[in-house]
Amino acid sequence: MALTQERKNEIIAEYRVHDTDTGSPEVQIAVLTAEINSLNEHVRVHKKDHHSYRGLMKMVGHRRNLLTYLRKKDVQRYRELIKRLGLRR
């Protein structure tokens, strides 16, 4: 379900651009991807949990907007990120 703070810190450390980075698009997309993957498993098991499904769709939309922003801003960083995360785009 929700990410633990330790797991979130690991993701931030892995994808950050500089030492104090917590809000770059790469970090935000990586954290959202981990949350989406976790929630996707929950929704797969609990098919009638429409409330969680709506939250999942909201997160996917937010990630899509961040990916679009990153692609417009810096295509090279965008391509590296989707390759590291294994996203289909």
Swiss-Prot record:
Q: Which family does it belong to?
A: Belongs to the universal ribosomal protein uS15 family.
GO process annotations (BP): translation
Function, as annotated, reads:
One of the primary rRNA binding proteins, it binds directly to 16S rRNA where it helps nucleate assembly of the platform of the 30S subunit by binding and bridging several RNA helices of the 16S rRNA.
Task: Kindly provide the name given to this protein in its UniProt entry.
Answer: Small ribosomal subunit protein uS15
Top-level taxonomic group: Bacteria
Cystine pairings recorded for this chain: none
The taxonomic lineage of its organism, from the top, reads:
Bacteria, Bacillati, Bacillota, Bacilli, Bacillales
Output the PROSITE patterns linked to this UniProt entry.
RIBOSOMAL_S15 (PS00362)
* SMART domains per record: Ribosomal_S15 (SM01387)
